Amino acid sequence: MTARIIDGKTISAEVRARVAAEVTRLKTDHGITPGLAVVLVGNDPASEVYVRSKHKQTQEAGMASFEHRLPADVPQAELMALIAKLNADPAVHGILVQLPLPKGLDSNAVIDAIDPAKDVDGLNPTNAGRLASGLFALTPCTPLGSIIMAKTVHASLEGMNALVIGRSNLVGKPLVQLLLNENATVTIAHSRTRDLPALCRQADLVFAAVGKAEMVKGDWIKPGATVIDVGINRTPGKDGGKDKLLGDVAFAEAKEVAGAITPVPGGVGLMTVACLLVNTVRAACAIHGLPKPAV
Ligand SMILES: Nc1nc(=O)c2c([nH]1)NC[C@@H]1CN(c3ccc(C(=O)N[C@@H](CCC(=O)O)C(=O)O)cc3)C=[N+]21
């Protein structure tokens, strides 16, 4: 049997529709237009693509979108001054600095400087700590999207064996916290883990977030398991053709074993942007002292 495909296109469109409805409510009932500021330093072509799609989707959801572009050789102080300006701007409810930053810039200092109330990436240590403590927090978009996708297959993740492969601050660690909030039993694997294939075969839920193309093989998957592929690995096309996007999972093999699986492209990546809109609405509500929205 081949796996059910968890379709990021459909699910992210549903999330965006809910965000748009919430934005309409905020405008009519409270006169608030949620605003997202995206800061892009340098001109990495992949980042350009993401930033463009963020801008488009923010506007389509009825929110205000502010783009700030700085040259790759911008001094750290100038970037910090922009963050301070955005922190103080009442029209801005969410601030995202596209990562990674060009060499020579200190991204930790930048992330630290973002007002935690506007940190829609959920990377500020205040938000990471609040999430780990079970307090209200803005949570990183990719883990949030990954959980939403898993929950389209399993209404409850309670008691399930979840394996998170990867321990980054952006994905692995916050994903672990969100899974614990869902009452899953969580194992974290990383580059030093012994016998990853055997560990993987015990997992009902596999989240692959390592950044290595097609590392997770089909025979690592427990039959019927749900596989969420967080990897986006850009690989040059054959014979000078277009670049290909590959996930961290060997999709063709894994889909013959898994019960449900996300594709790349068309999976978690689309959810990341949709969840950024969710976080911007959540931030706007919290900043204005309104209850947590239904998105
Ligand atoms: N501060 C920060 N926050 C981020 O959330 C962040 C970041 N920096 N830097 C880069 C990564 C990457 N990322 C993606 C967003 C959308 C897709 C996406 O839409 N992917 C589509 C198509 C992608 C394509 O065709 O190139 C898909 O998977 O189907 C992927 C990846 C957000 N990131």
UniProtKB/Swiss-Prot annotation:
Q: Which GO terms describe its biological process?
A: L-histidine biosynthetic process; methionine biosynthetic process; purine nucleotide biosynthetic process; tetrahydrofolate interconversion
Q: Name one GO cellular component term.
A: cytosol
| Annotated pathway | One-carbon metabolism; tetrahydrofolate interconversion
Binding-site list for NADP(+): G166, R167, S168, S191, I232
Q: Which reaction does it catalyse?
A: (6R)-5,10-methylene-5,6,7,8-tetrahydrofolate + NADP(+) = (6R)-5,10-methenyltetrahydrofolate + NADPH; (6R)-5,10-methenyltetrahydrofolate + H2O = (6R)-10-formyltetrahydrofolate + H(+)
> Which E.C. number(s) belong to this protein?
1.5.1.5, 3.5.4.9
Q: Which UniProt keywords apply?
A: Amino-acid biosynthesis, Histidine biosynthesis, Hydrolase, Methionine biosynthesis, Multifunctional enzyme, NADP, One-carbon metabolism, Oxidoreductase, Purine biosynthesis
GO MF, one term, reads: methenyltetrahydrofolate cyclohydrolase activity
Instruction: Name the InterPro entries for this protein.
Output: Aminoacid_DH-like_N_sf, NAD(P)-bd_dom_sf, THF_DH/CycHdrlase, THF_DH/CycHdrlase_cat_dom, THF_DH/CycHdrlase_CS, THF_DH/CycHdrlase_NAD-bd_dom
Q: Return the similarity comment.
A: Belongs to the tetrahydrofolate dehydrogenase/cyclohydrolase family.
Task: Kindly give the NCBIfam families that the UniProt entry links to this protein.
Answer: PRK14186.1, PRK14188.1
Q: How does it assemble?
A: Homodimer.
Q: What does this protein do?
A: Catalyzes the oxidation of 5,10-methylenetetrahydrofolate to 5,10-methenyltetrahydrofolate and then the hydrolysis of 5,10-methenyltetrahydrofolate to 10-formyltetrahydrofolate.
What protein name does the entry list? Bifunctional protein FolD
Tell me which species this is from.
Rhodopseudomonas palustris (strain TIE-1)
Q: Which gene encodes it?
A: folD
